[in-house]
Amino acid sequence: MRKGDILTHSFRPFPNNPSTAGGEVRKAVIDARERGIVFDIGHGMGSFAFKTAKVMLANGFLPDCISSDVHALCIDGPAFDLLTTMSKFLCLGMKLTDVVRAATETPARALRRENLSSLRPGSVGEASILALEQGTFDYVDSTGEHLAGGQRLTAAGVVINGSWWNG
């Protein structure tokens, strides 16, 4: 892989996960990041594990991009949607600003579409308005492991072409 290439399903369970049994990030993964490889979550049916994510985050290896790989087999779980995937990372300890950046600005930059992640004059002017809810929420990963979380992101509105959309 070359600088700027995107590796999706990067926090997957065994086999081929990015961490060792000893709780470290594999050297090849660290080397890939140093070469400029972009690490994307792509949470779908079989491609995301809390165990892997906990090891990666504990080692300071945050995902560059948080995305979902939602299709017919996982729309009813475990991935559900992008906001659920983002919420899982909040509950794993990532800061809200880092989670939002990894789902917006960084993917847009990786795709060379920076105008999609900006609200500056002259940009596309589209945004999802999110709410952060407190409560008790049950999250599940691709292996069936559960994580109790105290927060979740929900959709509160949409701005399209600079105007509030009323659907």
Predicted features, each with a name:
Residues M1, D31-R33, R120-P121, A148-R152:
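Solvent-exposed alpha-helices and their adjacent loops that cap or buttress functional pockets
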Residues M1-D76:
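Active-site core of metal-dependent hydrolases
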Residues P13, M45, E105, E133, ...:
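Short, solvent-exposed coil/turn elements at secondary-structure transition points
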Residues V124-G167:
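C-terminal cap of metal-dependent C-N hydrolases
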